[in-house]
């Protein structure tokens, strides 16, 4: 839907940048055996239906857009990974485990795509994990969180209204975010302003 298109925009920007850089290097005959990968990182959820409708849907769209890339998922929340293992016997990878797997597969270029809405605690941990693997790949880059630039707030507000207006009609609508102790908590107030 509209929201998924909005969420996929950062990965397209990042992927195009990586591809242009690779083309530049290849033109000079320096490197020609690029093995590309996209790592989709979400906070995760302990609700299987929600996971299928949202996280898995994004993964399917990314695989369809980039069929020549290795596409893997990772769950940034340790609590969610542990709950998935205990309740569903699913071994979800952490971002570090997924990057290690890609390294073992001989991946050379990685685009890390967080589905995080704000650039908060989880996203900063993800960036730190990616930094630790900088030497393991020829190139690794992390896309922005959904709300990274001022225009992102306007785009997301518009996408939300477009996807919800028929269902909501004239009724009041309450949207909630759980907040964070991180400075990125200000993102919620900025989003509220964009929605007014």
Enumerate the predicted regions with their spans.
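Basic polycationic patches enriched in arginine
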Residues: 9-13, 20, 28
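Active-site-proximal alpha-helix that buttresses catalytic centers in soluble enzyme cores
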Residues: 24, 31-196
